[in-house]
Amino acid sequence: AVTNKNVITLEGSKSTGIFGENKSTLLNDATGNITLKDEASVGIFSKSNTNKAQNKGTILTEKKKSAGMFGSKGELENTNSITTTEEESAGMYVEHSKATNKKTILIKGKASAGVYAKLSDATGGTASGENEGTDAVITIEKEGSAGMLGEVKSTVATGTATTLTLTNSGNINVKTKNSTGMMLTNDLASLAKDNVKAENNGIITLESTTKADNKNIGILANKKATGINSETINVNTLESVGMLGQAASSVVNKKTINLSAEKGIGMLAKDTDSTATNEDTINVNGKQSSGMLAQTAGKAENKKSIIVTAESGVGIFVSDTGTGVNTSTGEITLENKNAVGIFAKNNGTTDHTAENAGKIVLGKADGST
């Protein structure tokens, strides 16, 4: 067993604060403080370990390509504080195992991740990342980053029992540009998108400090993956998207997406075999925003409620070869005179359609618009 109750400060590159394998008990205790001052360093490294490695103290990485905790076939848990300062770093990075954050992860460098789960070995298997409970907060402060990131690599053998899961029941706050709350990429051609899944049961907020903080995504199913929102996504940055499914991915909204900033999109389906399905509520409050967008052969379906209060807002926008459907159970409410229920652009051919089988309601129920 390795327990740190004091201060560990490492000056060199490729340093490790606490290391253990096999049946090691690794613990940075409540009074423990690990600081890594050079690049490619790790606070706690657990390898092929049957025991869970725990951080109950403070871990700080000061340079690039570093991780607060790294588990290679070793489970990780953070119940206190992890901060990464420079690029290409991860708060918690796990391969073929499980990482659980229950408290604070702060990411200050670009191209980084709060929790990163990966499958790359030929054997496949399972990997998972969890941001668990109301005290769990992941904050992203620099571009090109993800609160939670999951990847299945093509090096995994075809036919293996392989699943990768990300779950958030806490808070993910994105305070930058070109970043995502939760992101998944499945590079294994034979692996079904249902096996690579991200679910939000908490709150994802894309929040802006300046107008340059734009083009963020709440949940990105980047390739052959599934994204599910079962709680709240707040889109408060310009030109940003609540949920995006591309490259044969699916995204499903089962609760609430709030679009507050201009030129936002609630749900976007892009590319062949990609779908976006709204099963609850999308609130379109930002100017020139759309509840759903289907483009380049993607399909968007509204099965419940899209409420457009925004000026020049659109319920379902269908672009080029996309397909958009307001189904028989779908309702688009337009509470602004300049709003449009379903808008089709460059959709001349018979194959690519915008269809309304449900209700489009004009004006507020009280007749004030």
Region locations from a protein language model:
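Surface-exposed loop/turn motifs in large extracellular/passenger domains
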Residues: 1-41, 45-112, 116-179, 183-240, ...
